[in-house]
């Protein structure tokens, strides 16, 4: 049963993160006037779909990943090329309204054509030999036209609705929006947790056994007001003061029953592993703070949690990239789907609150990782847009396609190696 719970939790967490990421791309793409033929949750065969305006929304069989198809983004080639035999339907202006790719359709009065030349990015036309007269004809593609395959309609984007023909700024926003929405999701989750759990105060809720606070006689209900020379008004002040005092003997003042008391103690040094490549040294008294529920403090506390988590993850990513050049790189620094599943299994056992917190950190991680300047990732494609903005011309299309393809192959190889490493570490 525990395996089933973990699998369901993994599917939900991974699905939410990818869906939010891809929705960010689509949201800004549509605002920029870029046509989005499909928004998919999951990968593989389609199991459910519905169309809203020009976008087909689909749920696919494999509950891992997802995507948004943007017209003219260079990631997909048109399904028609010279040498193919297709059928076309024409309007009264002799323009193509439907390009039919198979026999699963109900259209009548259509023409068969052997394609000799075609363009779906700039001039939008098909030129070929028609079956009815065996002559070569040139047909323009209507502004509102469709590919027809397996009974589904996929709209053909006019030139001004394609990603490639937009200016650099809307391109940048469209590409950056995926990571941005991951950051927004993480922030919302951190703030939501703060509202649910309350924000920590400097009042003691519980004292840990064999830690300095207990050994000094600090009890539940005591309010910490000073550590050394540092005044304490909220829980964050406790951490800041201890970071300065470190493990030196110091005086701690606290309020109990309206009276101020003081004790001398030595904070305990602890090491907390943050990621596979970084750890944090902290000094603690050994108490759990009481929480309070207010209207505005959770917003501030959630934002602080987001910044702290983002800083840790960003530092870990930078450290990982630096290790490639310093010779300290290890695949243990990376987690693929198998590694994430293993982590979810551990977090699920700690409860739903821990799972939400882990989801928030994972969302930050997904956003940051996607901004790494590797061609197949958002960060790499943003570099192409920056080049276009600086030099006032896009990167050569063939060069861009080749670079993205190499980047995609590189990412697939890395993912295979990371997945095998995760399987070896956790299950063999």
Swiss-Prot record:
Residues involved in Zn(2+) binding: 21, 25
Main location: membrane
GO biological process: proteolysis
Domain of life: Bacteria
Annotated active site: 22
Keyword Hydrolase assigned: yes
Family annotation (Pfam families): PDZ_2, Peptidase_M50
InterPro entries per record: PDZ, PDZ_sf, Pept_M50_Zn, Peptidase_M50
GO CC aspect terms: plasma membrane
Membrane spanning stretches: 172-194, 309-331, 352-374, 401-420
Membrane topology: Multi-pass membrane protein
Gene3D superfamilies reported in the protein's UniProt record: 2.30.42.10
PROSITE patterns: ZINC_PROTEASE
Subcellular location: Cell membrane
GO molecular function, one term: metalloendopeptidase activity
Keywords: Cell membrane, Hydrolase, Membrane, Metal-binding, Metalloprotease, Protease, Transmembrane, Transmembrane helix, Zinc
EC number: 3.4.24.-
PDZ domain segment(s): 186-269
Cofactor(s) the protein needs: Zn(2+)
Protein family (similarity comment): Belongs to the peptidase M50B family.
Protein's name according to its UniProt entry: Putative zinc metalloprotease SAR1238
Organism: Staphylococcus aureus (strain MRSA252)
């Amino acid at each position: 049963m525990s395996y089933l719970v973990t699998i369901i939790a993994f599917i939900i967490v991974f699905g939410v993160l990818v869906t939010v990421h891809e929705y960010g791309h689509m949201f800004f793409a549509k605002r920029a006037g870029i046509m989005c033929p499909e928004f998919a949750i999951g990968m593989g065969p389609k199991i459910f779909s519905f169309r809203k305006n020009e976008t087909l929304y689909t749920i696919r069989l494999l509950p891992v990943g997802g995507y948004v198809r943007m017209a003219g983004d260079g990631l997909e080639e048109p399904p028609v090329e010279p040498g193919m035999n297709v059928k076309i339907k024409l309007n009264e202006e002799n323009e193509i309204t439907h390009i039919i790719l198979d026999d699963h359709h109900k259209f009548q009065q259509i023409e068969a054509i052997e394609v000799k030349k075609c363009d779906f990015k700039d001039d939008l036309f098909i030129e070929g030999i028609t079956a009815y007269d065996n002559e070569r004809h040139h047909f323009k593609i209507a502004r509102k036209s469709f590919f027809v395959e397996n009974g589904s309609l996929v709209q053909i984007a006019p030139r001004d609705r394609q990603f490639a023909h937009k200016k650099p700024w809307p391109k940048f926003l469209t590409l950056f929006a995926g990571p941005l929405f991951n950051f927004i999701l993480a922030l919302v989750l951190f703030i939501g947790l703060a509202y649910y759990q309350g924000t920590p105060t400097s009042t003691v809720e519980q004292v840990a056994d064999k830690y300095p606070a207990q050994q000094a006689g600090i009890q539940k209900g005591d309010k910490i007001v000073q550590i050394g020379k540092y005044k304490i008004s909220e829980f964050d002040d406790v951490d800041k003061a201890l970071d300065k005092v470190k493990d030196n003997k110091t005086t701690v003042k606290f309020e109990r029953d309206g009276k101020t008391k003081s004790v001398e103690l030595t904070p305990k040094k602890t090491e907390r592993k943050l990621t596979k490549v970084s750890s944090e040294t902290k000094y603690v008294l050994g108490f759990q703070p009481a929480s309070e529920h207010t209207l505005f403090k959770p917003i501030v506390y959630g934002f602080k949690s987001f910044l702290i988590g983002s800083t840790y993850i960003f530092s870990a990513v930078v450290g990982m990239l630096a290790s490639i050049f310093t010779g300290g790189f290890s695949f243990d620094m990376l987690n693929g789907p198998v590694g994430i599943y293993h982590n979810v299994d551990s977090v699920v056992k700690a409860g739903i609150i821990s799972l939400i917190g882990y989801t928030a950190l994972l969302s930050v991680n997904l956003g940051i990782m996607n901004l790494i300047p590797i061609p197949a990732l958002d960060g790499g494609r943003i570099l192409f847009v920056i080049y276009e903005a600086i030099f006032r011309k896009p990167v050569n299309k063939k060069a861009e396609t080749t670079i993205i393809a190499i980047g995609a192959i590189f990412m697939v190889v890395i993912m295979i190696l990371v997945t095998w490493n995760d399987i070896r570490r956790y299950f063999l």
